[in-house]
Amino acid sequence: MDKPSFVIQSKEAESAAKQLGVSVIQLLPSLVKPAQSYARTPISKFNVAVVGLGSSGRIFLGVNVEFPNLPLHHSIHAEQFLVTNLTLNGERHLNFFAVSAAPCGHCRQFLQEIRDAPEIKILITDPNNSADSDSAADSDGFLRLGSFLPHRFGPDDLLGKDHPLLLESHDNHLKISDLDSICNGNTDSSADLKQTALAAANRSYAPYSLCPSGVSLVDCDGKVYRGWYMESAAYNPSMGPVQAALVDYVANGGGGGYERIVGAVLVEKEDAVVRQEHTARLLLETISPKCEFKVFHCYEA
């Protein structure tokens, strides 16, 4: 537990909590400070970490990630990282999280895409952050997320009550025809990346634009990473598919630099009104100039 991974299994979490004589919920704040060292903040030098407890009993980490020489909106916020980590690992709900600094409005909004978001419990470990005096903390010091965004705008305003939300199962029923490729050649490696990106696109959460997309990355050791587009009802806090795949890379790539990423595939609809190709290309060309980037167009079967 001295060097926490980005996912801590439930039995390991229970064991660590027992050793410290605390509950698993009380364990969360103690993991925040060591997790801050995992942040990648070459611009702000302000490391943020968030540690969340899912309904499965597993603990998940999130950190902020910044990209020099790019507009700031390409950045990954710690709470976005956490939610992406949850989706990549099939976690169905976030129950509690402890965070090193109060979530910005961007992240408070993004978290609304989780079902029953106002009931998620949050603890801010920074002693300089004082809670709203009208908000009542529980016995462990956690507050309802609803107290941080009391008059929320979210999926309830735009979607039916039974529509699957961000952490819930999705299948967008997308397929690819080889004729839709806009690249030349097709090695076994690129075929695998294409299938991984297609699978990611099928898990994409895009209920507002109906423009799902997915990305796969491969590093110089042949290890593959993936991520998918996740929308916010407020649009701007949405998580891009490349950023989501980079969460997988940061969490599972052994701490290497982005120059180790040598290949990338994006799958999206050709007629999408929200397209990822141009911004994805800019991001990848900036962080890994030698990365070979390919785009495949999909259609709904």
From Swiss-Prot:
Residues reported to bind substrate: N64, V65, E66
GO biological process, one term: cytidine deamination
Residue positions of the active site: E79
InterPro entries: APOBEC/CMP_deaminase_Zn-bd (IPR016192), CMP_dCMP_dom (IPR002125), Cyd/dCyd_deaminase_Zn-bd (IPR013171), Cyt/Deoxycyt_deaminase (IPR050202), Cyt_deam_dimer (IPR006263), Cytidine_deaminase-like (IPR016193)
Residues that, per the record, bind Zn(2+): H77, C104, C107
Domain CMP/dCMP-type deaminase: 23-156, 188-301
Stored SUPFAM superfamilies: Cytidine deaminase-like
A Pfam family hit: dCMP_cyt_deam_2
Regulation: Inhibited by uridine, CMP and dCMP.
EC id: 3.5.4.5
Protein name according to UniProt: Cytidine deaminase 1
